[in-house]
Amino acid sequence: MTEQPSYLKLLDQGLLETRVEELERLLESCTVCPRDCLNNRLNNDIAACYSGRLPIVSSYTAHFGEEPPLVGTKGAGNVFFGNCNLRCVYCQNYQISQTHKQQIKNEVTHERLAEMMLELQALGCHNINFVSPTHFAPQMARSILLAARKGLRVPVVYNTNAYDAVAVLQLLDRIVDIYLPDLKYADDESGYLYSKVSGYKEFSRLALREMYRQTGDELVFDENGLLRRGLVVRLLVLPNDVGSVAESIEWIRDELSPRVAISLMAQYYPTHQAETNKRYVLLSRRIRETEWLKATAALEELGMSEGWVQEFDGASYYYRPDFEDSETPFKDIRDFS
């Protein structure tokens, strides 16, 4: 029998609402992410993420471009939040992450977000996959509470850039079933230059330690091979070894566990500022096959055998969203191998 999502246990114990209220208090003087802006988002005072009291949902859809045990046969139920706490110059979702004046039009109530989750479940989606949830973690939790009361029964995926506050992650323990962090850099300099944040290395690694504390290195699957609980660390290979993928792999092995699942991704392509601004020339091309082979070799040499590896051929062409079409922003998606 498939184990129920952990947030339902919290609901039954009467603890889920308490957690939600604790998370929402962080919005009053915002410490929801490591930027610690201290603005009162409950009064819609905005700061770095340009986000106030209510969640912003730019798109929600069944999605088939995630890792195989998240996609299954019916897709992951992706909820794409608008805005972001990072400013990545190569963001593939920049149409929704860095257009705050347009995204305010996509603000929804918590009740409406809960309805979206239930709609995705009704479509047969195997999970609710929150994309870029960090700056909306309290709103996400409130909506999960509302949806759970109305019959939500699928796992919750926290698909994050890893620039997360440990205190927030601790409150999300057992609200989130699956952590899917994108570990971007092994140095602070790259984090500042390419994502406009300070201390990325330290904060992301602290966040991953907390995620690992909650889930361990075991992936829990159901009888159909669908992922129900666990931690999967994504590593996007960037050109010119920006990000130092091998160093991140080694840190995961040594500081977390050699059995942590890694999802190695080849889908990088220059977009947004990386495509046009000469300051970011190191990111101005797709990765070369030699760079990809170096990254896959690092996985093998460091003994990291759990996880998934994208196909190199064509990956940078297939994973190109267009959020002008909010209902189907992804086309022609290939799976991981």
Describe every region a protein language model picked out:
Residues 95-105, 193-198, 277-286:
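Short glycine-enriched, charge-decorated loop/helix-capping segments at active-site entrances
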Residues 1-45, 216-337:
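Auxiliary Fe-S-binding modules of radical SAM enzymes
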Residues 97-98, 137, 162-165, 183-201, ...:
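Conserved radical SAM core fold
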Residues 49-179, 187-189:
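Conserved Radical SAM active-site core
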Residues 192-224:
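Anionic-ligand binding region
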Residues 144-155, 207-211, 289-295:
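Alpha-helix-loop-beta-strand connector modules within alpha/beta enzyme cores
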Residues 110-113, 140, 204, 208, ...:
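Aromatic/hydrophobic pocket-lining residues that form the small-molecule binding cavity
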Residues 77, 128, 156-158, 179-181, ...:
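Hydrophobic faces of well-ordered beta-strands that scaffold small-molecule active sites
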